[in-house]
Amino acid sequence: MKVLYPGSFDPLTLGHLDLIHRASVLYEEVIIAVLENSTKSPTFSVSRRIEQIKESTKELSKIKILSYKGLTVECAKSLDVDFILRGLRAMSDFEYELQIAHTNRSIDKSIETIFLATEARHSFLSSSVVKEVAMFGGNIDHMVPAIVAKDLYKIYKQGDI
């Protein structure tokens, strides 16, 4: 069985990485799909986010990383994936993700959404929080993989944002 783990991963956090590791135990293949969203101004290019994920998951053999545009459910269908993985940090995540899951099911009933609860130690993490802490000079080493921390420190030290 294959599972699709979609997201912007801008940046990849240790919460994302925890879900990837756990999914790799549960599924034969974990496809990490990096969303190309033209309506947002990402901190990192899609290609850099893919590089960060590759570096951070290099010890895992069941991982495939790609980018996509458009609807996640259409991406899943095109890859012949039956499951979409979503992480839940809090009840607010569940409400939002449940809406998306129902929408996806209305488009394609063959694709199920699977929810995994985030480890408690990562429940406060979000890409937005990480960027804000980094922007104000805070330590993010316990929030993101080393490659991401290095990239963010470089960006915010140089004032590129």
Curated annotation (Swiss-Prot):
Its cofactor is Mg(2+). Pfam families: CTP_transf_like. GO terms for biological process: coenzyme A biosynthetic process. Reversibly transfers an adenylyl group from ATP to 4'-phosphopantetheine, yielding dephospho-CoA (dPCoA) and pyrophosphate. Its main location: cytoplasm. Homohexamer. Pathway: Cofactor biosynthesis; coenzyme A biosynthesis; CoA from (R)-pantothenate: step 4/5. HAMAP family: PPAT_bact. It is an enzyme of class 2 (transferase). It is found in: Cytoplasm. Belongs to the bacterial CoaD family. Keywords: ATP-binding, Coenzyme A biosynthesis, Cytoplasm, Magnesium, Nucleotide-binding, Nucleotidyltransferase, Transferase. It comes from Prochlorococcus marinus (strain SARG / CCMP1375 / SS120). Its EC number is 2.7.7.3. PANTHER family: PHOSPHOPANTETHEINE ADENYLYLTRANSFERASE. GO terms for molecular function: ATP binding; pantetheine-phosphate adenylyltransferase activity. The gene is coaD. The keyword Cytoplasm applies. This is Phosphopantetheine adenylyltransferase. The record marks H16 as: Transition state stabilizer. Substrate binds at S8, K40, T72, R86. ATP binds at S8, F9, H16, G87, L88, R89, E97, H122, S123, F124, L125, S126, S127, S128.
